[in-house]
Regions:
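Short, exposed beta-strand "edge-strand" segments with a Pro/Gly-rich flavor and a Y/T-containing core
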Residues: 61, 105-108, 158-160
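A generic short-segment signal for beta-strand/edge and adjacent turn/coil regions
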Residues: 6-9, 44, 102-108, 117-118, ...
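Glycine-rich beta-alpha loop elements in corrinoid/cobalamin-binding modules
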Residues: 1-99
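Radical SAM [4Fe-4S] cluster-binding motif and immediate context
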Residues: 112-172
Length: 172
């Protein structure tokens, strides 16, 4: 406990709050004030690199801002404090102003070969909706392209997992 709710209130000794997942990726601004970092896209590729970089910077005794500026250069890493949301007169989002030397656009990360990553996940906490379940990911995305659906509209091309690999993981 005792992690400050707003990113702007966190100090040098506080942990970084990292957000990810589909909702944070496709509309991070409602949560921007709470996050130190947001992973844009699929985290499997970028998360190990991000954590290695944070550890390297910590060992080099970099301060919080230096660490955040450094990881903001990684593809797929959005550091909200270095951007300011801009809105039109009607309140519609119009873009981001850069407050530091950071990328103007964040490159959404995309796992090219989903079979390179685990097919299954066992949730062992009793405090989740899927408590004590064995989850199997058979595909990502959707080919239907419904404009109201994030999975179909934002991820477009479906990526199906290899059936033999799925069956092997399930049997284990």
């Amino acid at each position: 406990g005792h992690i400050k709710l707003l990113a702007a209130e966190r100090g040098e000794q506080d942990p970084f709050v990292i957000l990810g997942g589909p909702c944070a990726s496709f509309n991070p601004e409602p949560l921007a004030a709470f996050a130190d970092l947001v992973i844009i896209g699929e985290g499997e590729e970028i998360l190990p690199r991000l954590l290695e970089e944070l550890e390297r910077l910590r060992l080099e005794k970099k301060n919080r801002k230096e660490m955040l500026l450094a990881v903001a250069q990684l593809p797929g890493v959005y550091v909200p404090q270095f951007y300011e949301a801009q809105y039109n007169e009607d309140g519609a989002f119009s873009g981001l102003a850069l407050l530091e030397k950071v990328p103007a656009q964040i490159q959404r990360q995309w796992v090219r070969e989903i079979d390179d990553f685990p097919h299954t996940s066992a949730i062992i906490s009793p405090y989740t909706e899927f408590a004590n379940m064995f989850l199997v990911e058979v595909a990502r995305g959707c080919g239907r392209h419904c404009r109201f659906c994030m999975a179909g509209y934002c991820f477009r091309r479906p990526r199906n997992r290899d059936l033999e690999g799925l069956l092997q993981d399930i049997r284990q």
